[in-house]
Amino acid sequence: MKLTCVMIVAVLFLIAWTFVTADDSRNGLKNLFPKARHEMKNPEASKLNKRDGCSSGGTFCGIRPGLCCSEFCFLWCITFID
């Protein structure tokens, strides 16, 4: 009985978390396509190519991998050398 209650609470929590963290889909495709078309005409405009605010290896990043240039973060930015 306890396990069933725990499972129900866990599923409800995950469903609520999904709705809270979901993106707003109103006018999503309308706003997405003109931006993508602009990036196709000018590849330099792509946000994926820009890494201006990234930190080099050995700097503190917490647990947010987006701060590191290498995208590997475990408290500090990790850079692998081949």
UniProtKB/Swiss-Prot annotation:
Belongs to the conotoxin O1 superfamily. It comes from Conus stercusmuscarum (Fly-specked cone). Residues 23-49 form a propeptide. Its main location: secreted. Delta-conotoxins bind to site 6 of voltage-gated sodium channels (Nav) and inhibit the inactivation process. This is Delta-conotoxin-like SmVIA. PROSITE patterns: DELTA_CONOTOXIN. GO terms for molecular function: sodium channel inhibitor activity; toxin activity. It is found in: Secreted.
